[in-house]
């Protein structure tokens, strides 16, 4: 039976059980260039079309995998060095806008790719301040995708981070705590308020998905891991990174090598956090996943393999999250080990096809 407050019956893992597993914070014995790839493990590999990833196959063949399961929020907050709990002195929570699509037996919750403008976020937060005025809740956008809620007193409900609830579910997630009913009531009332809002009427007229739900949450991973000295990422969470240098994600590994040189940062002290596969997972779209992965094979995995074989890098790692998450470490010139059997990536970094 699922732990109270978390959901079950979904093809996606229930991250509630990972709360009881200590997250393995990787300590770097030596600096190593890292590709953080959340969402790399597809939950149902048998759904995937044929994947053409020759460079990733080589990395898988000559690399060494070490398992380290991690819920999406733990992975993101740890490796990007996300810090939010210093933003307010008073009690607070967060609100993440969603597009929710209900099916006959499941619900799809999408938070990425909604292209919310700053103006839309401001208008909606202003309206919510009036709508939730009796509770004393004050909404304000930290970014178009993440809003803060200042509370008159600490919340007597707890709900998981947005990163742990997006995707497809047979049962909608719920909060826990003495006032979980207040949380559910507000979630429902806000959803009804959003339904007829002019912002959504305009979005639908423009062919964009409506913002028809809001996820209220307050649970954050407790992480003190030091992020890399230089990170490249387009994730909205990168705005809250403690890394001293955060740049936009490059189009290719050679572009990133040039950026690291311009920043006077050795590339082994840098990392790329590429989260485009998360949106494919949210949508449950294996074809978008396959297309993105095959682009990465040309833009990142092939140049990485060549850099390792030419000894331009002493080593590199690929890390991903999830129930079967972990680290694949590849050493320089490892391709000489010709006796290692060929491997084919089929949706899991550990190389297991189930």
Regions found by a protein language model. Give the residues of each.
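…; additionally, a secondary subgroup of soluble metalloenzymes is captured
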Residues: 7, 13-354
């Amino acid at each position: 039976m699922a732990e109270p407050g978390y959901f079950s019956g979904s093809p996606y893992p229930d991250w509630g059980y990972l709360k009881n597993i200590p997250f393995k914070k990787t300590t770097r014995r030596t600096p190593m260039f890292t590709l953080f790839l959340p969402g790399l493990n597809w939950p149902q590999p048998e759904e995937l079309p044929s994947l053409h990833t020759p460079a990733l196959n080589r990395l898988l063949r000559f690399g060494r995998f070490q398992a380290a399961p991690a819920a999406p929020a733990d992975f993101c907050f740890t490796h990007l060095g996300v810090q939010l709990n210093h933003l307010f002195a008073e009690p607070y929570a967060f609100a993440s806008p969603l597009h929710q699509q209900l099916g006959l037996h499941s619900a799809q919750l999408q938070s990425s790719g909604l292209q919310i403008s700053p103006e839309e976020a401001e208008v909606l937060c202003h309206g919510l301040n009036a709508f939730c005025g009796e509770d004393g809740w004050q909404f304000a956008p930290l970014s178009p995708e993440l809003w803060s809620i200042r509370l008159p007193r600490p919340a007597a409900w707890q709900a998981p981070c947005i990163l742990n609830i997006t995707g497809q579910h047979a049962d909608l997630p719920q909060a826990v705590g003495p006032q979980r009913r207040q949380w559910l009531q507000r979630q429902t009332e806000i959803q009804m308020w959003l339904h007829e809002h002019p912002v959504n009427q305009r979005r639908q007229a423009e062919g964009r998905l409506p913002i028809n739900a809001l996820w209220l949450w307050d649970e954050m991973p407790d992480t003190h891991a030091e992020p890399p000295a230089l990170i490249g990422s387009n994730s909205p969470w990168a705005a809250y990174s403690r890394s001293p240098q955060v740049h936009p994600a490059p189009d290719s590994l050679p572009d990133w090598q040039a950026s690291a040189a311009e920043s006077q940062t050795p590339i082994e002290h840098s990392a790329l956090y590429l989260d485009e596969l998360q949106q494919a997972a949210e949508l449950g779209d294996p074809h978008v996943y396959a297309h993105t992965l095959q682009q990465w094979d040309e833009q990142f995995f092939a140049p990485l393999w060549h850099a390792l074989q030419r000894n331009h890098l002493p080593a590199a790692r690929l890390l991903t999250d999830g129930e079967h998450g972990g680290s694949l470490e590849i050493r320089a010139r490892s391709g000489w080990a010709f006796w290692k059997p060929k491997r084919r990536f089929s949706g899991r970094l550990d190389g297991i096809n189930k």
